[in-house]
Amino acid sequence: MDLRTGYMFPCLTDGQFVEDDTLHSVALGIDSPISLSNGPDGEWARELSIAWAILLFTYNEQEAVEFACLRNQHWFCVDAKMNRDLSWKDIEIHEGGTSDGRQVNTGLCLSQEGATPIPTRLQLVLVGSISGGGLSLEYRPNLLSAEQAANVASTLETIMRALQGRTVSIGSIDVLSERNITDLNRFAVARRALPEGCLDDIITAQAVERGNSIAIDSWDGTLSYQELDTLSTLLAKYLRSLDLSGTYVPLCADKSAWAVVAMLAILKAGAACSPLDPSHPRSRLQSMVQLCDAKAVIATERHASLLQMDGVEVVVVGPDMSSFLQHQISPAEAPGPSHRDVAFLMWTSGSTGAPKGVILEHTALFMSISAYAAANQFSAETRCFQFTSFTFAVSLCDIFGTLSQGGCLCMPSETQRLTDLTGALRELHATFCWLTSTSLADLNPHDLPDLRSVTVGGESLSRELVARWATHLRLTVSYGTTETAGWCLLNTGLSPTGDARTLGRPTIPGVWIAHPDNVNRLVPVGAVGELLVEGPFLAQGYLDDEERTAAHFIPPPSWMTQFRPQEVTRLYRTNDLVRYNSDGSVSFVGRRQAHAKIRGNRISLPEIEAQVRHSCKDAQAVVELVTTKDQVEMLTAFLVVSGQESLSEAPLICPPNDCFRETVTNSLSVLEQSLPSYMVPTVFVPLSHIPLTRTNKADRHVLRKLAEAMSRADLVQLMTKPRPVEQLPLSPLERQIQGLWADLTNIPAESIGPDDNFFHLGGDSVLAIHLVPLARRHGLSLTVQDVFRYPKMKELGAHLEQEASQGSQRSKSQPIASFDPTPWKSVAAQQCGIDELAIEDVYPCTALQEGLMALSAQRTGAYILSMAQNLSPTVDLGRLLEAWQTVVKAVPILRTRIVRLTNEGFHQAVVDESIEWQSVKSEAEFRRMNQLNPLGLGTRLVRFALLLSAADQPSRLLLAMHHSVFDRWSGPLLVRAVEDAYQGQPVMPQYFKDFVSYVSTCPREEVDAFWRHQLSDADPTVFPPTPEPNYLPSPTKSSERIILLPLSRTHVTITTKLRLCWALVLSQHTGNADVVFGAVSTGRSARVEGIESLIGPTLATVPFRVRIDGSAMVSDALQALQDDAATMLPYEQRGLQNIARISRETRAACNFQNLLIVHAPDSRGHSTILKITDDQQLLDLFSYGLTLSCEVLDQDRIQCQAFFDPNMLEHAYVKVLLDQLAHAVRQIHAVPDCKVGEISLLSPQDQQQLQEWNPPIPRTGLTIHETIQRQCLAHPQKEAVCSWDGSITYRALNELSSSLASQILQRCGQPTSFVPLLMERSKWTAVTMLAVMKAGKAFVLLDASFPVERLQSICCQLDATLILSSSKHADVAQRLVSNPLIVDAIIGLPGPSLALPVVHPDATLYAVFTSGSTGRPKAVLISHASYGSGAEAHIPAALITPATRVLQFASYAFDASIIEHLSTFMAGGCVCVLSDPERTSSLAEAVAAQRANFAWLTPSVTRFIDPQDFPTMDRLCLMGESMRRSEIERWSSRVNLMQAYGPAECSVLATLRPSLTTQSDPRNIGCARGCHAWVVDPENHTRLLPIGAVGELIIEGPIVGQGYHGSPEQTQAAFPPVPDWLSDYHDGDLSQVRVYKTGDLVQYSPKLDGSLLFIGRKDRQVKLRGQRLELSEVEYHAYHTLAGTWELVVELINSQHNPALALFLAEKQDSPKPCGVLSMTPAWRSVMSRLRDTLASRLPPYMVPTVWIPITQIPLSSSQKTDRRSLQSLAGDLSAEQYQTYILASSSEATPGLTHSHLKEVPLNENELVLQDLVRQVFTGEDGSLSVASIPMDGLFTDIGGDSLGALALTSLAKQHGFHFTAGDVLGSSLGELASLRHT
């Protein structure tokens, strides 16, 4: 490999883009040193060449310089080897061959006479004349500005003078000219006085001035300046008590307001803060703690365990600051820090493998931050988004710079920062942000209206980003290092055309550019040198490293006195290479030596190299950051491992052996534990030896050039390059196949053996398609299906031999059978509005063409592709337009229009017509033209326009093409055809009719049988769901992700892997193992000669079914999918609309709303002639709710673009889907030998999000009665109970309950744990509950309405010996225990005053009974700590305050009655108790009388009451059952409506959602309160599911109960051991953690706010005919149809062993009645028929009930929930004859002709008669003749099997008869309504 790259003088245009390439001249101010009479070969010419070589070496220090030299009127290339230690006289000038083709742009021209033409490739030439005269520098402005040209000339003059008469080394020449010195004096910034101070003083001052103004707005809360100052002072006092003054205190925290509190506290305590990154390995963090000899560390609770070390105290900081309150009084008030004290210790990469600590003083940071704030225009209005890690020094500038000006610091969470940066910036209304360019590239300025200023640093910024952002806001480029306190250069206010490489000027003195190898020499302006920084804001140095400090912080060189007469103490060497522009600004060039930055992270290559060598044991290693030839930055490790070493003469790169692979695997596992991820090499390159320089150092230049000459794919392949196989005997046929495969895969033929798999070798579907014609040219008859079925060489060879021996003949295209286009030309011409003679041919459309036309008719503009061709001045426009005309003439599909022929369906007419060129002023105008005159039936489907410039000259050629005549595969083919025509090459005719012929010959019966079998019993779930029936998706948003694949070789294609992974994602998100999604095939596998080069729409969309089998091996599942895809190939052209008509199952399968498209890499090359105009045009190509377009960029990268409808999917949710897809793809690549069920879709992003949603939860240390007693003591006279039978104050509640507790203790003759309470609703219930607690017992509320046997069973289970009862129920109590305590008889009487026991918080508080599967109720046990922890969370969430008056409505058998009492008392509120008659007969009056303002109710109860009757009620929380949308609409405008969820086993309430609106999803049960909510596999709770997946909810945390009393087996089943995955989310001991399996199916809300959607019970999924039903949705539509006097329930029932959807309807009753079934009278039938008709017009057929049962009243359970079991029993008790009377209408199949009993069969007028006949014509054809009598005029078109294609056909036919409606009207209106839209 030739590594010589020539020499290119750098572009010095001062950051400006200049096109001028004319020659300009600047004269040199130096005379010829000697006479030129000795000619151009003389000594002077040699000296001039040497001077020129030194100049080139000065500006681009490259050891080998090359330039052109004129000799004998010919330009030759000369080169010279340069070395700084070399004497200039020893430089050897070597003359090479011609300079043509060499990469040189400078030259030396010494001519005899006259001017000599200078080649345009030479941009800088030294010109002299042998005949005498001076020298001049000829330059082109596109290389040098005039100022820089003068600088170069002055430098050359200085060099030439230095050579006169002296023998000096190159390095000793001072090349700094007088002009340069003048410029540097001008550039130097005058010193100015800067403020000195301490950082913590900033906050103290602002706290006084701005007090309650918000200082920090964080994801975890807000802090005012006063709060920030107070909290940090409080913590500082505690830190002083630990004697930390003068020490380093590491801080380990994620983004949080508390991190800033901790920083300030450390500073106020007189210590120095040392931020650590918690994402780094534990070993690295602990080594930093040891290096700084820390006595204490501060961490958030989540990361405290990372820093647990002997002798180091861990201080946990967070919202709970109570631990610090105990230390407010420090031993003595220590003085605050001095401005010369150390403030921060920041860690950066070190060269030895260990990190290095940079010491920053208060004053350095204070000055730097003050200047930073001023330069970025910070003010009190600034809302600064804190993006960078706390370990970056610039984070200090953001934090303290913002706070110093009184602004607001906006703090996102780690998850927001990494996964939803746009959302975080928008939510926090940030006005300023410091970002890396990588992060900026992911944002769109249009999405961030509040953002006014962005500063970019850390890595280079592209021109594209500058252009995108500079027009919208103030864009600044910053530069700085940790050693310079975060920054030292700013380039503010970039223009859209500004140069992002320009770092700007210093605002604090000063910066200098010295020679990288000799800082005692400054470099000329424009030359590359090392940046030196001086000033008061420099760091002290490096922690405990005097040697490194001395090397980087140097004393001022001697040249400093020329520019700084005052004292400069030291400078910092940055190791960064830069150059001056002529205006004094500095431009970045690169990193010096071994330091680099990658993705904004600063790295030390020696550190990484040291770690790699350590991990690789005996291997030699060199690590370099290289940029590949395809411009990909890769951290690359070059390795020589044991067993691969060889002599230096051997090829440098060698094939990897087993030892190399094992070494790399082991190294990666070690590096991932010891280095941050960005410091782990991306690729390892196997070498035979390390190349060396002359000084025996690793020749890194050679290694970099070696890697930079390769692409990313080339480097990656080096790790897995297949080894040559042993030469095995091959048959002649196998040898042919071997050659074909070698040609396609670029793998040497000798490396391909008979057992090799085509797909192992990199084959894919595209290469398989290209293999077919290649094989045909070699005489082999092959199909794409053959390649997939027989992927191994020997298998394919055997198959072809068998085919040949049997004389098999492949089918070829046949003419379209029995179709004469002649009769239809006139009809086609009429529909097209053209002359019949212009019609060349008419033939049928493919199913794809039909479907695309139908879909675009529903959504104007859909499936239209816009393309553009740039017209450069060099293009001959006339010739180009003629080329296009030639192609259109040769390719009939480009002249095709689509029409509909009566009784024959859709056909395509080829029209003999020329291109009609339009002229437009903008692309938007062209789009508007196409919108006003859409591409549709009868119109041109390919349109052309010329875009005119401001001068009315054509600047672009525009095309609009309908996808019914064009597909993606055709794009490069069309480009090639136009290019051929433009170059005068012939364009071969192409006939799409051949493909149509092939499709028409496929036997329809066989095709339909295939799809019927393929989709039999299909049970798919539509994803994403549509917001309403008949909704037409409009994908207007997109999201993108790159998937990086692990290196692997598998036997299947990338497409197959993506399909399996997408199926897994869909399965998780739908909760269905039977998945169907849309898949797109190229259609290029058809047996049509030349199909691979045919321009036309051959692609096909099919329903792709995947049945997930968790027990199958991944490799087997992949192979099965690939086999399915191969089997499907002959049947893929049937068309979705036709497949849907085959059966009910196929129709359901074709109802998918997500489409997967995989574009395999195409090796045919690309052209710049045609390109997609913009992303919006891509959005117009799709009509599904979600389309996933995946493009395989190379063997280890896939670009995934998701196009989606924002009304169906949230943008953040789509990103979750893409993350999970990427995670699944990586897993099946990395571990293909696992089982499908072992693949986890829980992505790292999911894990981070779940961690954030489930933070640590505090556990209460108090009992419930202790908490209530605090309220009693705080508010003794406040009303605690307001009851129908009297009122009780908190003092009375406390005293009465204590007295009663003593009596309980006295009466308990034997130990008892449980005390049942048998009371009617009364004020005494509260007293008894509290008394039982104080007595150390657990209460059990009994419902007195229960049968005595049930009550006896409960008491028996609990071994109860004492019952507290009221007088009313004394008789029943006597039957339960022998000696009950009658409360109202003894309350207030003198009694014993016994010492009450001390109750532990873990003691049982109460037991509540739930129904059990065995018929025996289960007693759930809840402790004080469990309920108290839950109450501390749900009380503030539900807004329960001392002013809250809670209605006590729930039955005592329902645990809601407990929350009504206890949580109210704990908050200091009042419980309002109604009597039973008030509760049932006069609820509104009683609530008003007691002024109740809060209620916990079930949704069923709210359906019986009117919000207007409850004016005092301002808060309502619904719980206990699923909420309907109707409840939200009725109540949300009247009260603060909330929804809660919680099983009895989890302290009543586990989730709560406040403040519902009419836009709220009724399924959303809110976020976890006092617990963690996890979604697990319903069949395996040890498997945590990804975000968005449907799974079982398990609850973990302190609210989880103790289990079931006396039922260990049931307890074990419901409260299982803690799953292993929980340890990933807990830092502490898990022995006390409990989890509860709810049995409820949920999924996280797509809004990704941590809330949950309730799906249903695990054991009763509601599905009917393969469709999941939301019963509440059907109920919602039914309620909206009926007046308010009705009650209804929709339920799935089973009758005659068949499931059916039933609607139970009842009139509202004033008083309870027994529930029973009523007869179906004519009146009932009339009501229900009207209701059914309305539902049928709004809902899909499967959601319309078929069984309609009138009943007396909707039954309720004792807990006031709808009793659905009773309804199912009512239906089940019906006889077969009775059941038939309640079937209002039979369900409709997809087959046309089925009628409903209520349908009107006789049209009323002529319009209806005509329309009825037109409908009949639409259904005449392959489905047979449809009876007119079976076409209902008051029914929907879809009722008789109509679909979108039929709607388009009807629209076309009806238009000819005067009807004016759209395809959308047909799908959404009744036929009678359509008939009225006729204009006669």
Swiss-Prot record:
It catalyses: 7-carboxymellein + L-phenylalanine + ATP = ochratoxin B + ADP + phosphate + H(+). GO terms for molecular function: ligase activity; non-ribosomal peptide synthetase activity; phosphopantetheine binding. The keyword Repeat applies. Its EC number is 6.3.2.-. This is Nonribosomal peptide synthetase otaB. GO terms for cellular component: cytoplasm. Residues 728-804 form the Carrier domain. Belongs to the NRP synthetase family. Keywords: Ligase, Phosphopantetheine, Phosphoprotein, Repeat, Virulence. It comes from Aspergillus niger (strain ATCC MYA-4892 / CBS 513.88 / FGSC A1513). InterPro entries: AA_adenyl_dom (IPR010071), ACP-like_sf (IPR036736), AMP-bd_C_sf (IPR045851), AMP-binding_CS (IPR020845), AMP-dep_synth/lig_dom (IPR000873), ANL_N_sf (IPR042099), CAT-like_dom_sf (IPR023213), Condensatn (IPR001242). PROSITE patterns: AMP_BINDING, CARRIER, PHOSPHOPANTETHEINE. Residues 1269-1665 are annotated as: Adenylation 2. Residues 840-1250 are annotated as: Condensation. It is an enzyme of class 6 (ligase). The modification O-(pantetheine 4'-phosphoryl)serine is found at S765. NCBIfam families: AA-adenyl-dom. Induction: Expression is positively regulated by the ochratoxin cluster transcription factor otaR1, probably via its binding to the conserved 5'-ACGT-3' bZIP binding motifs found in multiple copies (3 to 4) in the promoters of the OTA biosynthetic genes. Expression is induced by sucrose, glucose and arabinose which repress the gal4 transcription factor, a negative regulator of the ochratoxin gene cluster. NRP synthetases are composed of discrete domains (adenylation (A), thiolation (T) or peptidyl carrier protein (PCP) and condensation (C) domains) which when grouped together are referred to as a single module. Each module is responsible for the recognition (via the A domain) and incorporation of a single amino acid into the growing peptide product. Thus, an NRP synthetase is generally composed of one or more modules and can terminate in a thioesterase domain (TE) that releases the newly synthesized peptide from the enzyme.
